[in-house]
Amino acid sequence: MELIILVGIATALLVVIITLYLLQKKNAAPETKPAAALQRGVPQRVQEGVPRRAQIARNQRNRLRQNAPAAPAGQVAPAAGPPAAPGDSDHENEGQVDDDDARVPQGAVLDEKMGAKKRAKMEAKEQKRLQREQELHDREQRKVKEAKEEAERKHQEDLEAEVERKRVEAERLAKEERERKEHEEYLKMKAAFSVEEEGFEEGDADEQDSLLADFIQYIRDNKVVVLEDLAVAFKLKTQQVIDRIQELQADGTLTGVIDDRGKFIYVSEEELSAVAKFIKQRGRVSIAELAESSNNLINLTPISAGGEEASS
């Protein structure tokens, strides 16, 4: 009797357990079917938890806004575009993503599953960026080279200018030294002449008259005298000899002419009268005829030499 009761209780418990299991399974079936149907319409990337490209673009824009500096107070922020319609397709979002590609910061993490076209576009932009950097580098290198060449050229010009300056300075110093020596020699000569002149002028009147008579007789005897030799003979300066001859010509003591070779040619009064008589007799006389006749009318032989020839 007790065994039958125990079997009946066990059977009842088993039926209750099976019933509860079936009820639980029946309630869980309607929730599973809509979830399965929803997954059939969702792309695989969404099911795998990969964000959509529009979401990637929005995330990139958000990062750009966070990294971008705040706009100045006077600058007006660009107006936002009209809100997108709820029914816009993914193609519109993809176009917006393409427009924002230029603002993608360097080194931004990109989706590994982006399309081949977008990847090619990004690679082209990267290539252009590298090309621009290379051009800038080449330009900087060229500027550095040109600056170096300009500095070398300027240094060479400075060296040449310094050499030229030293050469001119050396020539100037040499000229000054030469002029200084000439001036010193001139002063020494002037001092010597001054001493000789003072000694001559401090003599008594008789000695001066004697020297003047000797001076006049020397010129008359030699007929043609070199002024420098005459100055040495009487211990005078050349200019003093010239001045004294001109004074003697002015008072009629001496007659003659000083040529351009530094010589004085003495012509006596008789010889001048003979030349004047010849010109008066001929009327018109050419220079050649006058020179030829003067050689015959004017005797330029020194008296001492003429006396020796006559005695011999």
Swiss-Prot record:
Q: Tell me which parts of the chain lie in the Cytoplasmic compartment.
A: 24-312
Q: Which GO terms describe its molecular function?
A: ubiquitin-like protein ligase binding
Stretches with biased composition (Basic and acidic residues)? 110-162
- Listed transmembrane segments: 3-23
Where in the cell?
A: Endoplasmic reticulum membrane
InterPro entries linked to this entry? DDRGK_dom-contain (IPR019153), DDRGK_domain-containing (IPR050899), WH-like_DNA-bd_sf (IPR036388), WH_DNA-bd_sf (IPR036390)
Q: How does it sit in the membrane?
A: Single-pass membrane protein
Pfam families, alphabetized: DDRGK
GO annotations under biological process?
protein ufmylation
Q: Does the keyword Nuclease apply?
A: no
Q: Which UniProt keywords apply?
A: Endoplasmic reticulum, Membrane, Transmembrane, Transmembrane helix, Ubl conjugation pathway
Bias kind Low complexity: ranges: 59-79
Q: Where is this region: Disordered?
A: 59-162
Pull the Lumenal topological domain ranges from the record: 1-2
Q: Which cysteines are joined by disulfide bonds?
A: none
Gene Ontology cellular component annotations, sorted alphabetically? endoplasmic reticulum membrane
Q: Which family does it belong to?
A: Belongs to the DDRGK1 family.
- What's the subunit arrangement here? Interacts with Atg9; the interaction is transient.
Q: What does this protein do?
A: Substrate adapter for ufmylation, the covalent attachment of the ubiquitin-like modifier UFM1 to substrate proteins. Required for ufmylation of Atg9; protects the nervous system during aging, possibly by stabilizing Atg9 and supporting its function.
What's the protein called, per UniProt? DDRGK domain-containing protein 1
Q: What is the lineage of its organism?
A: Eukaryota, Metazoa, Ecdysozoa, Arthropoda, Hexapoda
Q: What's the gene?
A: Ddrgk1
